[in-house]
Amino acid sequence: NESKETIEKEDFVKRNSAIYEGIEAKNINIKIIDYEEESLTVKYNTAFDTVAGKVDFKNEVAFLEQDDQYKMVWSNSVIYPGLTEDDKVRVSVIQAQRGQILDRNGRMLAGKGVASSVGIIPGKLENRKKSIVRIAKLLGIKPEDIEKELTAKWVKEDSFVPIKKIAKVKELDLLALDPDETIVEEQKRQEKLLKISGVMISDVEVREYPLKDEAAHLVGYVQNVTAEDLEKHAGEGYTNASVIGKTGLEGVYEKELKGENGCKIYIADSEGKEKEQLAYKIVKDGKDIKLTIDADLQAQLYKNFKSDKSCSIAMNPFTGEVLAMVSTPSYDTNAFIMGMSKKQWDRLNKDKKQPLYNRFRQVWCPGSTFKPVIAAIGLQSEAFTGTDNFGNEGHSWQKDKTWGTYHVTTLHTYSPVILKNALIYSDNIYFAKAALKIGTEEMERSLSMLGFHSSIPFEIMMAESKFSNNKHIQSEVGLADTGYGQGQVLVNPLHLACIYTSFCNDGNVLKPYLLYKENAKAEQWISEAFSKSVSQEVLEGIKSVVNDSHGTGYAIHRKDMILAGKTGTAEIKESQSDTTGTELGWFAVMTPDKKNKKPILIVSMVEDVKGIGGSGYVVKKDKAVLDKWFGKN
């Protein structure tokens, strides 16, 4: 009865529940140690797991005999020895520092940065309505959004109420001889904000992406956790204050980057001072992720293609290290960290060029960049030899009348019609015939062996390359079209780059990877895809594409080294007679010499190259990248 007078049943349940739920108590085990019959005292041991680790303590409680029943003499100390009515059990979370994402040279791609937090002190805000409208206009948000923040329950007259994060203007950037115009404009905006009474701008720690647009699709970004995230990742250490990787490598390496929050459970007195620590879990900061990516190359590829709808993959052709992964157009990932307005989001989301679309993860019609692959399959299967003359058919050819009005066309005639020349002149007719000689069964078997209709063993999930919509080439015309990279063939650019590694690695297709390793060594994805002699013969052919003056890739040839490569222009149209279709321009280029000090393989694809030079447009762009990579020849 005395216990009931001390605390109501509802309050008893509420206090106990609040404590045990707050510390996330699990696996509760209470064991009686001793019982003193004379004093009716029970000694017991309590043990349970919490968010901060194991709690284990001894305690005792007295009982009274009333109405032939034993009843507990309850007090707060039953919950924990020494706990009083005014004490609180508190949980303090120590947030783990998120790991950095670094390039191969230690340059930060994602990590700790500083932004400016624009806030308002309500008590100092003069002409409230007009000031809020002006602040909203300068920040690109709605006045009602500001009002919502200012009327939150916790806000007092002297509170600093954060409204929006914006880019921090660094003095060094302003002192440059020719400061960036956007930085100057940002400085002017902040000066206007500070002239409004009650506005303050302070530094705030944020996740920063120094390469901005240049690596957005690769690195990705984090955002504050949502209720859905907390539900989905329950028990994984996320709190309302956590961020989580949403896209790109921020998402792929979320587990490694996030670390483990530290936690302390303690008893606080009525003034909030710590009386006793019950449990403590040490904070474990997230791991840094070092990539094979070269930030300078990543930036250079982006700058050269930023006005196009394109994607580029760069690799070391002898190790499988991925040096760059670029998709354009792009977006500044920092905008997601600062907080994007609906207007900004709509503009980004409705842009016809689709800057949010990650093109390097997709599959595309490869056009003539597929011809070296067909050449290797034909030689490997002994369907033909490199010296077999396929005969000069002019600019148009069909196998027989069963093809109806369908003809394969090509741009150039030459002699003799052998493999090396067919690669130099990018002869569609030669490779259509080559595909027919290979045959449907062998073509499907070989392409399946090369990873078509299978996933690429890579950290980032890529769309699967395919040679047909249903894993079977349906017709003779479809087979012929496959020979020059048309028909239903769709290839992921990383996959194509991997297949090209076989031409300078004795026929072995290398496995691509992103995590940096000291003294990198190649790992084979597909061993002996082609024989050494076959890969060498194809390599000589694609060397000629770049180094023979008639070659479609001759514009990129260099005097200081030998390059190998293949151009491609893929037609995207409804029928052979369609003149309104678009074209994809491709170029694959690499350094085939293992002695080269800066080995590189680049595969680039640009949409809508019709009327601007086809694949030649891409060759010029990649030439500028290689000139920067090697130093102009």
Report each predicted region and the residues it spans.
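Extracytoplasmic/periplasmic proteins that interact with beta-lactams or build/remodel peptidoglycan
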Residues: K14-C311, Y331-P355, V363
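Beta-lactam-recognizing serine transpeptidase/beta-lactamase-like catalytic domain environment
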Residues: A268-A279, P317-S368, V373-S604, G614
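Core segments of small alpha/beta cavity-forming domains
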Residues: N1-I19
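A short acidic/glycine-rich loop-to-helix N-cap element
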Residues: E607-K620
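Solvent-exposed, polar/charged alpha-helical surfaces in well-ordered, non-transmembrane soluble domains
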Residues: K14, K129-K137, E191, A216, ...
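Membrane-interface anchoring segments and C-terminal beta-barrel signals
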Residues: W586-D593, A624-L626, K632-N633
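Short beta-strand segments enriched in hydrophobic/aromatic residues
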Residues: Y44-F48, V222, F503-C504, T591-P592, ...
